[in-house]
């Protein structure tokens, strides 16, 4: 197909819990609203009520603003008679006092006594296998790679597949999260700090996009960058367009 230049390997390849060093700590820097820790998520999935932290985006980034009680009312993610899979694997247990207890906070961070690097151990080999499969049919196809913003791209070397392109995603973080356009307010996605003033916002946007290009060039053997996703939500201003037709 002459009109197809290449194929994306995996959209925003997420590590999930892989590499998380403490299952009882907040998961990542981007926290908004009620955010259970990974351990609390396991307990909620097992029907156990949890008091979870509530986060808000402030001038200096995300900050904890309160707590919220989430009660699944006994509803579980598992079939009747089946334990939580992570409980079966010894990640947590119900103690003699009837309380849940985290046994292995680093369960997803260590494998065979070694620290787990998601990009090196899983994503990079996957992309190489994907590239091999695609090029067995289309030898000249480009292969697009991206991570979950703002996480790093995988390191790429001469032994890896060639003709790789970074398909990093970029959005105006304020528009994406608050669903309203404010040209005088932005957010630096690498630090989650607010940027104030229209010129400062535009400079911040340019710097963020330049950083995406530089990271790909430095970490992926001179790979070019094609922004793989950008745009605005359709439901701005409380879905005004759906109501007005404008």
Model-derived segments and spans:
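Active-site region of glycoside hydrolase catalytic domains
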Residues: 1-240
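Extended, alpha-helix-rich binding/interface surfaces that flank or overlap catalytic cores
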Residues: 246
């Amino acid at each position: 197909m002459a009109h197809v230049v290449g194929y994306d390997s995996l959209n925003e390849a997420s590590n999930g819990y892989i590499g998380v060093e403490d299952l009882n700590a907040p998961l990542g820097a981007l926290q908004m609203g009620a955010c259970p820790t990974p351990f609390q998520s396991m307990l909620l999935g097992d029907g156990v009520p949890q008091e979870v932290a509530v986060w808000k985006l402030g001038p200096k980034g995300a900050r904890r603003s309160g707590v919220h009680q989430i009660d699944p009312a006994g509803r579980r993610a598992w079939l009747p008679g089946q334990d939580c899979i992570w409980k079966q694997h010894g990640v947590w247990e119900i103690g003699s006092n009837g309380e849940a207890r985290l046994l292995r906070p680093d369960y997803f961070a260590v494998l065979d006594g070694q620290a787990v690097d998601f990009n090196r151990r899983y994503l990079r080999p996957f992309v190489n296998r994907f590239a091999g499969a695609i090029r067995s049919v289309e030898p000249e196809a480009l292969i697009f790679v991206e991570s979950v913003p703002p996480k790093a791209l995988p390191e790429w070397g001469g032994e890896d597949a060639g003709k790789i392109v970074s398909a990093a995603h970029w959005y105006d973080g304020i528009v994406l999260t608050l669903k309203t356009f404010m040209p005088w307010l932005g957010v630096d996605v690498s630090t989650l700090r607010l940027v104030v003033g229209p010129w400062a916002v535009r400079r911040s946007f340019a710097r963020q996009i330049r950083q995406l290009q530089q990271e790909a060039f430095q970490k992926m053997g001179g790979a070019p960058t094609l922004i793989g996703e950008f745009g605005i939500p359709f439901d701005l201003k409380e879905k005004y367009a759906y109501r007005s037709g404008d």
